[in-house]
Amino acid sequence: MSRVAKAPVAIPAGVEVTLNEQTITVKGTKGSLTRVINTDVIVVVEDNEIKCSSVEGVKTNAQAGTARALINNMVVGVTEGFEKKLQLIGVGYRAKIAGNGVDLTLGFSHPLVHELPDGVSAVCPSQTEIVLTGTDKQLVGQVAAEIRGYRPPEPYKGKGVRYADEQVRRKEAKKK
């Protein structure tokens, strides 16, 4: 069994876990998440713990660790939630919340409107910051990556949309 799958996932108070065949549903204060688990993984809920083990085989060991990590992210998501911070660096780069989307001005000839999916909300503490929050870690990260993809940070001046904790590797300009 994988090292990750050996550790059980603790179920905190206020979280309800239901298991139907290979579908697991986790309900908490911030919402509920549902995921289909791989058929090579055996999931057992007992004594406020979720245990994952694999059917015999080398490939399935990795699947058990993956399933355990995904279930842990579901439990953390419905209790605490996930957040990604983005910074807009560049002259005239601005962001504001417009309805169910983020209105971005990133130096193009037109403003961009990125629609937010259900389960992800955005807040702009300032014109150059976006904070995305939600219960699904994958979905929050996906939306952040899509917004960053409009204008990724470039290595010469560092302009663009970057994650708050991202270090942009800078290059020196070409010399004559």
UniProtKB/Swiss-Prot annotation:
Q: Where is this region: Disordered?
A: 156-176
Q: Which SUPFAM superfamilies match?
A: Ribosomal protein L6
Q: Cite a single GO MF annotation.
A: rRNA binding
Composition-biased stretches (Basic and acidic residues): 156-170
Q: Which residues form the signal peptide?
A: none
Official protein name in the record: Large ribosomal subunit protein uL6
GO BP annotations, alphabetical order: cytoplasmic translation
Q: Which family does it belong to?
A: Belongs to the universal ribosomal protein uL6 family.
Pfam families given in the database record: Ribosomal_L6
Q: Which GO terms describe its cellular component?
A: cytosolic large ribosomal subunit
Quaternary assembly: Part of the 50S ribosomal subunit.
Tell me the name of the encoding gene: rplF
* Summary of the function given for this chain in its UniProt record: This protein binds to the 23S rRNA, and is important in its secondary structure. It is located near the subunit interface in the base of the L7/L12 stalk, and near the tRNA binding site of the peptidyltransferase center.
Record key words, sorted: Ribonucleoprotein, Ribosomal protein, RNA-binding, rRNA-binding
